[in-house]
Swiss-Prot record:
The lineage of its organism: Viruses, Duplodnaviria, Heunggongvirae, Peploviricota, Herviviricetes. InterPro entries: UL28/UL56. It comes from Human herpesvirus 1 (strain Angelotti). The gene is TRM1. Residues 433-489 are annotated as: Disordered. This is Tripartite terminase subunit 1. It is found in: Host nucleus. Its main location: host cell.
Length: 785
């Protein structure tokens, strides 16, 4: 018998099923926004029913989602809330637009309203963050802006009050409703994959660096976590395959539509897409063929005619169609455009055959605007019949095509073009009448010129048959070298051609290798830019982690306020004497150097934000690893990282330099402005707290006094929170220190709990000592005089 499924698992499964249904509805909304409004009017009853269901779901789930936001968010709950909000808002807007269209009948006005063409860009959200060091203003425009802001908020969590963080996170959530809540597909204007995310950084930290710095590797990183690529496969015969099975059509209509579709596909299928010879080359070949046809064996063969025959031989035997590098990487953008035209023609033909009208979808209603876009925008928008991978291949082939259009590379990659040029030059000389009447074997004035033209056109650039015959011709009788000035000139010209060929061959190899390396490096960016992107789980997970950290602080203060016994030292009389006594007792001692590594890790644990929690994983890492991820992801300057790393070691617990706070002014930032100075002041306060508690444990021998964070506790399956005894740093300047000296056996705060509030390190330690004194072996030390 299978084990029963736990209640949280069942709830998660239900939320996943609900999430899938809401995503389907959002996808329908996105389709109807771009579809002919006449079709949308026919779907009004179903659309209204879905809108009513979304209203009911939102009304029923919203209280629970809001309660969970104050308790513990999950990426699933965040995504579901964003989708519900977007589905409710955009579904109502679509219904209103369809009803307006039913009255006005203006297709352009319908698309202007549904697509937001008359409204400002919705992806600009101003965010204000109030910190102890001042107010920070930012603007969110991309998905990576959201991730960067959340990482920055995570780093500055110790100087940010929970109220200010909650207000800023609410503005971030509003941006994510339109950005992430719009379904699976990411709008191209929202994605900027050149900015690496925290997952990119973590992946690079665990892979071989090949001697490169992390900054250099991040600069070349294409993020595929905030948005992920989706493989899109398009079937060219999809309409032909599924039309026979379309529901709601009569057999006669279906047969007529299939007949029209076949006729339209046959008419638009013309053209093979292969390159055709230019008219100029065609006329040259015709002229050469006419001269050769007029010659027979009874006539003397002139050197020019022999050169024409040899060039025609190389042209006939050198057909490299579909084999050369040029053909392998030729641009195929026209073929993609032809495919789009064929798809559009077939769709319109079927629409006319079935419905008697051409549907006015968004791309057709605004076709003139889309046609005015440049090539880059058109590629980003894409098409209905071409997949992004087809566009990428066409772009890469276009790059090679453009690179190979230089005269040198064109002659090397396409030797037949050299033969065409040589044939044209020979015909030009013969047209001048210089060599047409000279007998074969004679020493006419164009003999050397024709031979050189043939060699340049065939063997000069590496065609078969070159090399050996040339070498023999250069030498005189007996192979002893040239004997006349003509032989010297011929040999010099041949040497120049050979050096030119070798240099061009080497240049071509380097050029093509460099181009190939560039294409390989840029292909990832092209794929990320042009392929369809879907939302990843990074943003919901990051938002949930940061929001949970600040919600835990507010929840901790609310729960401790309801404890059975609450001692508030912030306004109690006689606290100053306790402060002075404990301060004097601790300043006489210094921290054991052997404890410095452990208290340094404690410092890192308290400074680190709630986002990077590697120290709590199943395979836990030390706190310095999580802090490393935190500071590196915000680009902290090297001198600040060095200062942070040596903050505890620099003090060492000796002298009184570590005690920086005045009485009842612990975690007070009055008179301090700026993020970095405020951060440094918070580091000093945290160092003071750590050293004071360490000395307190060693002086009074009461065991280790635990320093904890409010977000150390997670809810149980019953929704309860356990807070073990210890001193908690709340990061709240009004009440920065809370000591739980007694709690219920299960660790929950209740009537038996004893809680101490304070704004002073030494007075709260004295209160802890008072509660620990009856349990100490020697009964504790004397109190303040």
């Amino acid at each position: 018998m299978a084990a029963p499924v736990s209640e949280p698992t069942v709830a998660r499964q239900k939320l996943l099923a609900l999430l899938g249904q809401v995503q389907t509805y959002v996808f329908q909304i996105e389709l109807l926004r771009r579809c002919d409004p006449h079709i949308g009017r026919g779907k009004l009853p179903q659309l209204k029913l879905n809108a009513l269901q979304v209203r009911a779901l939102r009304r029923r789930l919203r209280p629970g989602l809001e309660a969970q936001a104050g308790a513990f968010l999950t990426p699933l709950s965040v995504t579901l809330e964003l989708l519900l909000e977007y589905a409710w808002r955009e579904g109502e807007r679509l219904l209103g637009s369809l009803e307006t269209f039913a009255t006005a009948g203006d297709v352009a006005a319908f698309f202007t309203e549904t697509m937001g063409l008359a409204r400002p860009c919705p992806y600009h959200q101003r965010v204000r963050l109030d910190t102890y060091g001042g107010t920070v203003h930012m603007e969110l425009c991309f998905l990576h802006d959201v991730e960067n802001f959340l990482k920055q908020l995570n780093y500055c969590h110790l100087i940010t009050p929970s109220r200010g963080a909650t207000a800023a996170l609410e503005r971030v959530r509003e941006f994510m409703v339109g950005a992430v809540g719009s379904g699976l597909i990411v709008p191209p204007e929202l994605s900027d994959p050149s900015h690496p995310c925290a997952v990119c950084f973590e992946e690079l930290c665990v892979t071989a660096n090949q001697g490169a710095t992390i900054a250099r590797r991040l600069a070349d990183r294409i993020c595929n976590h905030v948005t992920q690529q989706a493989q899109v496969r398009l079937d060219a015969n999809e309409l032909r395959r599924y039309l026979p099975h379309a529901a709601g059509l009569s057999d006669a209509d279906r047969a007529r539509a299939l007949s029209v579709l076949d006729h339209a596909l046959a008419r638009t299928a013309g053209g093979d897409g292969q390159p055709h010879p230019s008219p100029e080359n065609d006329s040259v070949r015709k002229e050469a063929d006419a001269l050769l046809e007029a010659h027979d064996v009874f006539q003397a063969t002139t050197p020019g005619l022999y050169a024409i025959s040899e060039l025609r031989f190389w042209l006939a035997s050198g057909d490299r169609a579909g084999q050369t590098t040029m053909d392998a990487f030729a641009s195929n953008l026209t073929a993609l455009a032809r495919r789009e035209l064929q798809q559009e023609t077939a769709a319109v033909a079927v629409e006319l055959a079935l419905f008697g009208r051409r549907a006015e979808h968004f791309d057709r209603a605004f076709g003139s605007h889309l046609a005015a876009l440049d090539m880059v925008d058109a590629l980003i928008i894409g098409g209905q019949a071409t997949s992004p991978d087809d566009q990428i291949e066409a772009l890469i082939r276009a790059c090679y095509d453009h690179h190979l259009t230089t005269p040198l590379l064109r002659r090397l990659v396409s030797p037949e073009q050299c033969d065409e040029e040589a044939l044209r030059r020979v015909l030009a000389r013969m047209g001048a009448g210089g060599a047409a009447d000279a007998p074969k074997g004679g020493a006419g004035p164009d003999d050397d010129g024709d031979r050189v033209a043939v060699e340049e056109g065939t063997r000069g650039l590496g065609a078969p048959g070159g090399g050996g015959e040339d070498e023999d011709r250069r030498r005189g009788p007996g192979g002893q070298g040239p004997e006349t000035w003509g032989d010297i000139a011929t040999q010099a010209a041949a040497d120049v051609r050979e050096r030119r060929r070798l240099y061009a061959d080497r240049l071509t190899k380097r050029s093509l290798a460099s181009l190939g390396r560039c294409v390989r490096e840029q292909r990832g960016e092209l794929e990320k830019m042009l392929r369809v992107s879907v939302h990843g789980e990074v943003l919901p997970a990051t938002f949930a982690a940061v929001a949970n950290g600040f919600a835990a602080r507010a929840r901790f203060c609310a729960l401790t306020a309801g404890a059975g016994t609450v001692i508030d030292n912030r306004s109690a009389p006689g606290v100053f004497d306790a402060h002075r006594f404990m301060r004097a007792s601790l300043l006489r001692h210094q921290v054991d150097p052997a404890l410095l590594p452990s208290i340094t890790h404690r410092f890192f644990e308290l400074v680190n934000g709630p986002l990077f929690d590697h120290s709590t994983h199943s395979f836990a890492q030390p706190p310095n690893t999580a802090l490393y991820y935190s500071v590196e992801n915000v680009g902290l300057l090297p001198h600040l990282k060095e200062e942070l790393a040596r903050f505890i070691m620099g003090a060492g617990g000796s002298g009184a330099d570590w005690a920086v706070s005045e009485f009842q002014r612990f975690y007070c930032f009055d008179g301090i402005s700026g993020i970095t100075p405020t951060q440094r002041a918070a580091w000093r306060y945290i160092r003071e707290l750590i050293i004071a508690t360490t000395l307190f444990a060693s002086v009074y021998r009461c065991g280790e006094l635990e320093l904890r964070r409010p977000d150390c506790s997670r809810p149980t399956s019953e929704g309860r929170y356990r807070y073990p005894p210890g001193v908690y740093l709340t990061y709240d300047s009004d009440c920065p220190l809370v000591a739980i000296v007694e709690s219920a056996p299960d660790g929950c705060i209740g009537p038996r709990s004893v809680v101490v509030y304070d704004r002073d390190v030494f007075s709260i330690l004295y209160s802890v000592l008072q509660h620990l004194a009856p349990r100490l072996p020697d009964g504790g030390h004397d109190g303040p005089p």
